[in-house]
Design a protein with these regions (language model features):
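Well-ordered alpha-helical segments embedded in enzymatic catalytic cores
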Residues: 108, 166-170, 261
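Von Willebrand factor
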Residues: 144-179, 191-192, 218-219
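An amphipathic, basic-hydrophobic helix/alpha-beta surface used to engage anionic
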Residues: 1-139, 180, 184-185, 192, ...
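Von Willebrand factor type A / integrin I
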Residues: 1-35, 45, 173-177, 194-296
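A generic local structural motif
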Residues: 69-71, 167-170, 198-200
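Short, electropositive alpha-helical surface patch
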Residues: 135-151, 294-295
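A conditional alpha-helix N-cap/helix-loop micro-motif detector
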Residues: 106, 160-164, 194-195, 258
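Short amphipathic alpha-helical interaction patches enriched in hydrophobic/aromatic residues
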Residues: 92, 96, 152-156, 273-276
Length: 296
């Protein structure tokens, strides 16, 4: 668990609630409702036939029994199940712009959750590192939502790595009916050539669920300033090395690697029609989420 006291944790959760609930009510509720559809049409009632009704909806049993034409009425089955796949690996603690990825992930998760609750949808979450660390089954209600936010802030992973494939496989197996899923991560889970390691799991998951990717990153992590000889350590692998940051070729190669990773992941998401938005920790995430909702 985190080092926050119970009182500090409560204050932080409350602060996030006040900020994100207002955003959800004022900005996102309508966009969310339009962007994410229900599972289809569900039977509502039987009523007397009216001129213009589709004869394909005639209820012939009721018509025969009452000796008057009756039709079946259908309504959109609006209620969704929303699942947040939250990357809780060590890299989420990185932050040089006043906020860590952990902070921004919590706020984005809260906005999505409040938007869902406003629309009477269920919300659940599972946290992953290189394994699924915790699963919170989908439910409705403010207290459940605040439980999810508190867990995101407080949770500490038992391992250090990242395995997006494991998270996607768990989604496919644990949630049997189609859900609306949001994958929140820095998306750095790649092979040596920069290609995503999770293509097969992604392919299976999107056949069952409506998946969107929200990449949260710190731009300062993806470029190295010229500050001479420095000691760096990977928060997930634990490996460390001395690096001469005055070497222009090294800095350029480092930036090119991240650029290649981004291009390959974007290409993969386009291949499987997965909506993706990238949000920097020092950017306004409201704009990013609006873009995600409006582009659907």
């Amino acid at each position: 668990m985190s080092n926050l006291s119970a009182n500090d944790l409560l204050k932080k959760v409350r602060k996030i609630e006040i900020k994100t609930r207002a955003l959800s009510h004022q900005i996102f509720a309508g966009e969310y409702h339009s962007a994410f559809k229900g599972r289809g049409m569900a039977f509502s009632e039987v009523r007397e036939y009216q001129y213009g009704d589709d004869v394909r909806n005639m209820d012939w049993n009721v018509t025969a029994r009452l000796r008057s034409p009756y039709v079946k009425v259908f309504e959109e089955e609006r209620e969704l199940t929303v699942v947040l796949l939250v990357d809780v690996s060590r890299s989420r603690l990185f932050g040089t712009a006043g906020a860590s990825r952990k902070d921004i992930l919590a706020e984005i998760a809260a906005v999505l959750s409040f938007s869902a609750i406003i629309n009477n949808d269920k919300v659940g979450a599972h946290f992953f590192s290189d394994k699924v660390e915790k699963f919170i089954p989908p439910k409705k209600g403010r207290s459940h939502l605040l439980h999810i936010i508190r867990e995101i802030i407080e949770f500490e992973p038992t391992t250090d790595g990242t395995d997006i494939s494991e998270a996607l496989r768990y989604l496919t197996n644990a949630i049997k009916k189609k859900c609306t899923a949001f994958l929140l991560s820095d998306m750095i889970d790649v092979n040596e050539d920069g290609s995503p390691r999770y293509e097969e799991a992604l392919k299976v998951a999107v056949n069952r669920h409506d998946l969107s990717v929200i990449e949260v990153y710190d731009p300062r992590e993806r470029c190295i300033p010229d500050v001479g000889l420095v000691h760096i350590k990977d928060s997930e692998s634990g490996r460390s090395a001395w690096v001469d940051t005055s070497d222009k070729k090294m800095r350029r190669a480092y930036e090119d690697w991240f650029r290649n990773v981004g291009q390959l992941s974007s290409k993969l998401f386009m291949k499987y029609n997965v909506d993706k938005v990238s949000i920097a920790v020092d950017d306004d995430y409201v704009k990013g989420l609006m873009t995600l909702f409006q582009n659907r």
